[in-house]
Amino acid sequence: MKQDRSSALFQQARQSIPGGVNSPVRAFKSVGSDPLFIQSASGCTITDVDGNTFIDYVGSWGPMIVGHCHPQVVEAVRQAAGSGASFGAPTEREITLANMVIDAVPSIEMVRMVSSGTEATMSAIRLARGYTGRDNIIKFSGCYHGHADSLLVRAGSGAATFGIPDSPGVPADFAKHTLTAEFNSLDSVRQLVADNPESIACIIVEPVAGNMGTVPPRDGFLEGLRQICSNEGIVLIFDEVMTGFRVAYGGAQERYGVTPDMTTLGKIIGGGLPVGAFGGRREIMEMLSPSGSVYQAGTLSGNPLAMSAGIATLSLLKQPGFYESLEEKSRHLAEGITDAARLAGYPIQTTRVGSMFCAFFSGQEVYDWAGASGCDTAAFAAYFKAMLNEGIYLAPSQFETAFVSAAHTDADIEATIRAAARCFKLIS
């Protein structure tokens, strides 16, 4: 596969952009190659600057659930851009998207729009602290909630990929208020709560961990968190930046039937444009400025282009049978890859929730960060490169999730399974 132009652009980028990329995992460092520079995308495919076209399972890290360049989304953005890119003032579109989110997500009675998932989680935690009058928070090893200082403690995603769970530049005084439990372990949560009585403001969790691969919650885990928080006066925050509108229209909380106090969103609700949101119970949300005393603001919050793309995307998701079709495609793909590995005699563990899935290069069940971090990352890198040569674009890290979109056809799924079968045989 020719990559001359991508490699040349990467060398140029490294002279003006730190590491040559604007988000670390894009550098392909963990798989030992230069990144692809993308020229265009359409449906479920992306094309790089060297003219190579790939079936895409990254989907811009989750937002592109209806596929790239969906005509309805493109037209919505085009019309919005013709009226002005940003006003720094309220628009009717903000109300429309807010009401769509409120109607969809069980926990959300009011919602505030922001510009990124990091901004959403950072603001939600500030609000939880203001609401409870407490300082400490609990997060989980391997769960990534953005790059805010207090959340870069034993994080997943890019931090896991590079083996840097704690970033330099985060003061110890910030990190000391972040307590870390083990995902899928209620005992570890109970111990932290017992050791820090009446000091925990919130527990923040990815209801399906998607930044250490795809790790589903075990039976009773989310229900147990809900009970602990209710008993102890702790705000339960579901970080659904990834799972929101992905694993169900109402997110993981709809799929699992557990309602948190607050929810953070991003990715899909912007239809591919920069966006985030956080919402929850009215009594909590009304503490936000200007109605309350907890401050939060943003120049581009509620950006009209992002709101328009979000409205168009959520309208598409509401079409009858959308999630049923996506579920079937995703099931077929995950089972096909599992069977391909088994027939090649290659040990992997495949996990899936809705249209999120991961092939862990491990012979052991993965249900927490300890299991995920024990995977054979060298084997994954070999698989990644082999799949890329087959025209299949996966996330360049063992610790990321793959995403299926509505644009993937049965033929795309079958082609991917056949490619995986050849790749497992090649690396076994």
UniProtKB/Swiss-Prot annotation:
GO terms of biological process kind: protoporphyrinogen IX biosynthetic process
Domain of life: Bacteria
Keywords, in A-Z order: Cytoplasm, Isomerase, Porphyrin biosynthesis, Pyridoxal phosphate
Organism: Pelobacter propionicus (strain DSM 2379 / NBRC 103807 / OttBd1)
Stated family: Belongs to the class-III pyridoxal-phosphate-dependent aminotransferase family. HemL subfamily.
Major location (coarse): cytoplasm
Protein name as it appears in the record: Glutamate-1-semialdehyde 2,1-aminomutase
Lineage of the species this protein comes from: Bacteria, Pseudomonadati, Thermodesulfobacteriota, Desulfuromonadia, Desulfuromonadales
Gene Ontology molecular-function annotations: glutamate-1-semialdehyde 2,1-aminomutase activity; pyridoxal phosphate binding; transaminase activity
Biochemical pathway: Porphyrin-containing compound metabolism; protoporphyrin-IX biosynthesis; 5-aminolevulinate from L-glutamyl-tRNA(Glu): step 2/2
Reactions it catalyzes: (S)-4-amino-5-oxopentanoate = 5-aminolevulinate
Locations listed in the record: Cytoplasm
